Regions:
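Membrane-interface "cap" regions at the ends of multi-pass membrane proteins
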Residues: 1-63, 75-76, 200-207, 483-517
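A generic transmembrane alpha-helix motif of multi-pass inner-membrane proteins
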Residues: 51, 393-403, 425-517
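Transmembrane helix-loop boundary segments of multi-pass membrane transporters
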Residues: 54-64, 136-148, 168-177, 354, ...
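Membrane-helix boundary/coupling elements in multi-pass transport proteins
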Residues: 91, 114-129, 232-239, 300-340, ...
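TM-loop-TM module centered on a large, flexible mid-protein loop between adjacent transmembrane helices
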Residues: 97-99, 104, 136, 140, ...
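Transmembrane helix-boundary motif of multi-pass solute transporters/channels
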Residues: 15-21, 25-135, 233, 447-457, ...
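Membrane-interface loop-to-helix entry segments
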Residues: 29, 148-198, 228, 249-259, ...
Length: 517
């Protein structure tokens, strides 16, 4: 396998010799299907309606569009090396497989559990805000009080069923929901620009001076969560028709789309409210900012539809993250990091059924736990939004930032160890710069974690919640060391995926040939 060039031989299918039950079905996804699947995780409408008002209102950052551009540059630098790595390693456990190849199997074992916890936390957290918003819809349009956990548990069941189906069917469901919500946001953006507030078409939001203040670091941490999803593309490499081409293309398309879409949408919000008034309005209305501005320029009927799509967009994100967790569990089961049952797929759909069931059970337990401890009246956002959604979302975001930083180092090590450092020098420089930027963001995230989760200064949550990722990281390292000592055969397979099975196949063939001599 050449590592000094970006050219690779054509691979028509990736499977294992142990049968299709231990292989994800190849050829299920093309560029469009994969792009829609990873973009669904970014939940465009949830970001515009939920994240952006928080940054405007609580952190006082008017120049939010600049933040998305800055992060796009950082993540594009990260993707230069990450995408090249995806041409050489096709594994549903993308992050941990890359880290294992570059930094060793023990580091890969640790990364696998960090990835599992991080993506699971992000997925489960969305059930909170989903249940809360569905409850609001019932109260608004049906005058019916509904506890948030009822629609949340219903969503757990529906997502669990859909995840057992073929991934191309999942992509179609995600694609339809994503396209509709993006279209509605674009309509709002155009309407806001066409009918601006009294300050007119101001470009004040693109002025770097608007980034000054104590809220900059925290705002950067909030914004990076909007990009989460693009890095999932290699997770589906085994299910794409041409992974060497499709995965790389989708990552850069996703980063470009997210940066442009969110930069323009956050600017449109400042135009609709006025740059001088946006922070005050966002602080007063919160997630209602978008809907209030929308009703003013597009009317109540459009805004009602926007409310519904806000909910379906969250559902799409839950399904997207669920699929990723299931595939990480599959990859870990296939390589012995989890019980072998997780490394098998459904015979009918080719989906990682046991991994999907694992995430369904985790979501069920967490939602029930938050529901049981919620003693607030119906309609109160404390448990579902301020706790479940905010806590879990920030735990997940921190884990993913650290994984990206580690993967950047792994990319450098991977190519240098193979004597391809000179041929890949610019990609390695890009990875190094990305690592420094991502570590800076990680430090800011931990430093401001009390602000991110809405806790007071000195709150136990400021170290307890990020400590979950730290504990997982250390626990994974210990587990990796135990495997190296007690089960060296399993340790040697970490990160190899299908290649480990192909090596076994070659060894068995060689042994059979020797026996027949």
């Amino acid at each position: 396998m050449s590592t000094g060039s970006s050219s690779t031989s054509e691979i028509t299918e990736i499977s294992t010799f142990k049968g299709q039950e231990q292989a994800l079905r190849a050829g299920r996804l093309g560029t469009a299907g994969l792009l829609l699947s990873v973009l669904a995780a970014s939940a465009p409408l949830m970001v515009v309606a939920g994240v952006m008002p928080t940054i405007f209102g609580l952190m006082g950052i008017v120049g939010q569009p600049i933040l998305y551009v800055i992060l796009a540059v950082v993540l594009a630098l990260f993707s230069v090396g990450y995408a090249e790595m995806s041409r050489h390693v096709h594994n549903a456990g993308a992050f941990y497989a890359y880290i294992a190849r570059g930094l060793g199997a023990t580091a890969g074992a640790s990364a696998s559990f960090v990835a599992l916890v991080a993506y699971s936390a992000m997925q489960v957290g969305i059930y909170g805000i989903f249940g809360f918003e569905v409850s609001n819809l019932f109260a608004t349009y049906l005058s019916t009080e509904l506890a948030w956990w009822i629609p949340a548990l219903a969503a757990v069941a529906v997502v669990g069923v859909l995840s057992w189906l073929k991934i191309d069917l999942n992509a179609k469901v995600l694609g339809v929901l994503l396209l509709i919500e993006c279209l509605l946001v674009i309509i709002f953006d155009v309407a806001a620009v066409a009918d601006p507030a009294k300050e007119g078409l101001s470009l004040h939001a693109f002025n770097p001076d608007t980034l000054t203040g104590a809220g900059f670091g925290t705002a950067l941490c909030f914004c990076i969560a909007a990009f989460v999803g693009f890095e999932q593309a290699p997770v589906y490499a085994e299910e794409t028709s041409s992974p060497q081409i499709v995965v790389r293309r989708v990552m850069f398309l996703a980063i470009g789309f997210v940066a442009l879409f969110f930069a323009l949408s956050s600017w449109a919000l400042t135009i609709a409210a006025g740059p001088s008034a946006i922070n005050a309005q966002a602080g007063k209305l919160g997630p209602g900012l978008l809907f209030g501005l929308s009703e003013g320029v597009l009317g109540k009927s459009f805004t009602d539809v926007l409310h519904v799509l806000f909910v379906t967009g969250m559902f799409a994100a839950m399904l997207s993250f669920h699929n990723v967790v299931a595939r990480y569990a599959f990859a870990m089961g296939r390589e012995g990091l989890l019980p072998a049952a997780f490394g098998r797929t459904n015979k009918s759909s080719g989906a990682p059924g046991t991994g999907s069931l694992l995430q369904t059970v985790i979501a069920l337990v967490v939602v029930i736990a938050f529901a049981v401890t919620d003693h607030k009246p119906t309609g109160d956002p404390t448990a579902p939004v301020l706790h479940l959604f905010t806590w879990m979302g920030n735990i997940g975001a921190l884990g993913i930032i650290l994984l990206m930083a580690a993967a950047s180092v792994a990319v450098i090590a991977f190519f240098v160890q193979r004597g391809a450092g000179r041929a890949q020098v610019w990609r390695l420089v890009a990875s190094g710069l990305a690592c420094l930027a991502l570590l800076t963001i990680a430090v800011l995230t931990v430093k401001d974690f009390d602000v991110l989760v809405g806790a007071g200064p000195g709150s136990v949550l400021s170290w307890l919640l990020p400590g979950i990722i730290g504990l997982t990281l250390v626990g994974g390292l210990v587990y990796g060391l135990v495997l190296r000592s007690a089960r060296p055969d399993v340790h040697a397979r970490i990160g190899l995926g299908n290649e480990a099975f192909q090596l076994d196949k070659a060894a068995e063939a060689a042994a059979a040939g020797t026996a027949n001599m």
